[in-house]
Amino acid sequence: MDEDVLTTLKILIIGESGVGKSSLLLRFTDDTFDPELAATIGVDFKVKTISVDGNKAKLAIWDTAGQERFRTLTPSYYRGAQGVILVYDVTRRDTFVKLDNWLNELETYCTRNDIVNMLVGNKIDKENREVDRNEGLKFARKHSMLFIEASAKTCDGVQCAFEELVEKIIQTPGLWESENQNKGVKLSHREEGQGGGACGGYCSVL
């Protein structure tokens, strides 16, 4: 681990096939967008280091497949994760309806009780919306999740989603602290009075 890196975090991106998980990942890690991106088979894996509130964290981001036939592969992917981004497509209500199934799977396979979950409504650049923002916000509040709407195509909300998730994880020392006890790392604290989250309150911290 780099000396100035506070911790390495395992982040999962889950949700139904076609909601834009891979597009969100590539926009965040490589700042690219491919409208013809093929569905992920199995899992994709990216690493990116970011700085939030003066704390540098290395993210190991796992993009899990949404197809039902790959569900049997997921238990090992959930193991040890500190954060999860659960994605639905705001233009496809069926992907929103199935969020409960993903939460049940997360509860079944996740090895941590204090894992941080972020709900992302993707594809807000499209006009044929089927899921209102307030519906997403209500669902997130019900399940104590962070929430944001985003567009991998236009980049709206993408950086914020990851930064807000990482900020919340860092604020939950039990998620990562034990792995760094012998490394002499220190958490940098935001100056008193500074608030609104990593993105100035753009995300809802619930």
From Swiss-Prot:
At which residues is N-acetylmethionine found?
M1
The gene name reads: RAB18
> Effect of altering T95M?
In WARBM3; uncertain significance
Which species expresses this protein natively? Homo sapiens
* Lipid attachment locations (S-geranylgeranyl cysteine): C203
Query: Mind listing the UniProt keywords for this protein, alphabetically?
Result: Acetylation, Cell membrane, Developmental protein, Endoplasmic reticulum, Golgi apparatus, GTP-binding, Host-virus interaction, Hydrolase, Lipid droplet, Lipoprotein, Membrane, Methylation, Nucleotide-binding, Palmitate, Phosphoprotein, Prenylation, Protein transport, Transport
Q: Which ranges belong to the motif Switch 1?
A: 31-45
Major subcellular site? endoplasmic reticulum
Q: What disease is recorded for this protein?
A: Warburg micro syndrome 3: A rare syndrome characterized by microcephaly, microphthalmia, microcornia, congenital cataracts, optic atrophy, cortical dysplasia, in particular corpus callosum hypoplasia, severe intellectual disability, spastic diplegia, and hypogonadism.
At the top level, the lineage of the source is Eukaryota
The record's listing under PANTHER family reads: RAS-RELATED PROTEIN RAB
The protein depicted here goes by the name Ras-related protein Rab-18
The residues listed in the UniProt record as binding Mg(2+), with positions renumbered to this chain, are S22, T40
